[in-house]
Amino acid sequence: MAKGKDIRIRVILECTTCTRNSVNKKSTGISRYITQKNRHNTPSRLELRKFCRYCYKHTIHGEIKK
């Protein structure tokens, strides 16, 4: 059995370009992805390059609070 807090947690990644400038987009919305991270290996905020379907290009997606 697991003791204490879980090591792997679920995090939500949100497009940083969509949240900054919502004027230059072709369609409305904010791209979000759900993934997991290991709390011991990555204690800081997670940032990954993912495809944003609203900006139509690969952008940096950062971890947000739940």
UniProtKB/Swiss-Prot annotation:
Signal peptide: none annotated. One of its GO terms (biological process) is translation. One of its GO terms (cellular component) is chloroplast. The keyword Plastid applies. Its main location: plastid. It is found in: Plastid, Chloroplast. Transmembrane segments: none annotated. This is Large ribosomal subunit protein bL33c. The gene is rpl33.
